[in-house]
Amino acid sequence: MKITFLGTGAADWYYEEHGNMKGYRRNSSLLIDDCLLIDPGPNVPNALEVFGKDTYGVKYIINTHNHRDHYNADTVEYLKLRGAEFYPFESGETKVLGKYTVSAYRSNHSTCEKSVHFIISDGEKRLFYGLDGAWLMYEEVQAIKEKTVDLAILDATAGENLGDFRVFEHNDLHMVVAIKAALEKNVNRWMISHMARILHTEHEILAEKMAKHGFEVAYDGFETEI
């Protein structure tokens, strides 16, 4: 399973204002095997072009929730015109999209009745996509424990800002370290994404710090196999 981070930023990154800024991050979005898109946010068409992806290759679109940085109707229409289909999910649902089995779990976010995290399997590898959201919910933890997850991607919006009000719907770095400690034996590899512009250091500093805790820090355009 190949994954490409089309965006790794939180909602406070705006292309018009910050696009030329060093370390610019688009709104968070992930592409699996160049065909399964998680979160059709406003920056996705630009990211697909910049990172050399075939827009006609995107076949499946799924969405964690409808906040503006994760869902954009124009992006969905843009990809539908190129052959993609949008598949809505509610928590507790499992759907088969081609070779992928996609299960949705309620997430701890401000729109929790609609906001979900995903576990995606291609029959060989298992990916947990856990943003947006704070502490993981019971059902998704049990699903992670049932069968080894090859890669877990966690929300790290709030940085090191201990006591930040966002921790009731987003993780800070202390929280992701604690989650990893509790699920270490169930997950082979850990990454963080969804970094807020105003709450994080430069990427290189963050990556060095989090490597000490066994985390990789995603950045726009980063591509890896799991």
Which positions does each model-derived feature cover?
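Conserved beta-strand hairpin/beta-sheet module of binuclear metal-dependent hydrolase folds
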Residues: 1-50, 114-131, 151
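Active-site metal-binding motif and surrounding structural segment of the metallo-beta-lactamase
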Residues: 35, 42-87, 148-152
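Catalytic core of the metallo-beta-lactamase
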Residues: 93-148
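Cap/insert and terminal regions of metallo-dependent hydrolase folds
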Residues: 135-223
